[in-house]
Amino acid sequence: MKRYLITGGTGMVGSHLVNEIKQTDAHITILTRQDKTSNHPKITYINWSKEGWQHQVPDIDIVINLAGATLNKRWTSSHKQAMMLSRIQSTQTLFELFETREHKPEVLFNASAMGYYPPDLFTSYTELYRTLPFDFLSEIVYQWERFANKFKQFGTRVVLGRFGLILSDDGGALEMMELPYRLYVGGKLGSGRQWYSWIHIDDLIRGILFTINHDNAEGPFNLTAPIPERQNLFGYTLARAMHKPHETWAPKLILRAVLGQMSTVILDTQKVLPNKLHALGFEFKYNNLRNALDDLIKA
């Protein structure tokens, strides 16, 4: 039986992941910030905001660290601090948990983001690309991965999952992207040429578990579908799937003014390819954006 420790296990990605893992021979310990009672024999919740929580954690084989304040909220100075500290502090806390334990985890899967890569209209980024931080979001990613890599001191295999734009039917980015189309004001954002490197939630969960279970999976992995789309075509495809028009245009200056720094998520994007997943033989269920949207959207 595999023993999992998961942070962020009650969020969108975490909930899908827990639902998949509990169907296997496993026990799941989920760290939360509030008291929660489990009604499933394979799941235990621990409130890690309480003193002495560390003593409740059993020996662990696999750590999955998904904790972090949402990016889908206006980036005030206080929220930017929360975005950074929530990720770094949770990772450091996990490191300190195992630092004094004899039993070390075999694998750490640490969430990350494609914000590691600089915005570019022409470059196709693979995991071979290396860079230093160049803006606030890349600084978060850089520090998050740096703290996660400390687990290598334990002999733990560390996987850094650089998530793409996650498409799910229960919240997240797709819900926000659908709203303007439901209001008949969907269309091009900025130049419309910026890349959206997306991934269906089912493929994301499968990709996470694939890297955890594959002994040769280590280091950064781009968890994005093989065929990214430029925003204008992405929006057009979304509109067709929803049977709505794609006719308006929101200029970059307007988006910057309304959204502030958060606008970087939709304007300053990257074309990211999952080369390492392909090299290890992973097969995507949803390569094509229209197929992914047809599966998720309830018109």
Curated annotation (Swiss-Prot):
PANTHER family: EPIMERASE FAMILY PROTEIN SDR39U1, SUGAR NUCLEOTIDE EPIMERASE RELATED. SUPFAM superfamilies: NAD(P)-binding Rossmann-fold domains. The lineage of its organism: Bacteria, Bacillati, Bacillota, Bacilli, Bacillales. It holds the Pfam family DUF1731. NCBIfam families: yfcH. This is Epimerase family protein SERP0438. Belongs to the NAD(P)-dependent epimerase/dehydratase family. SDR39U1 subfamily.
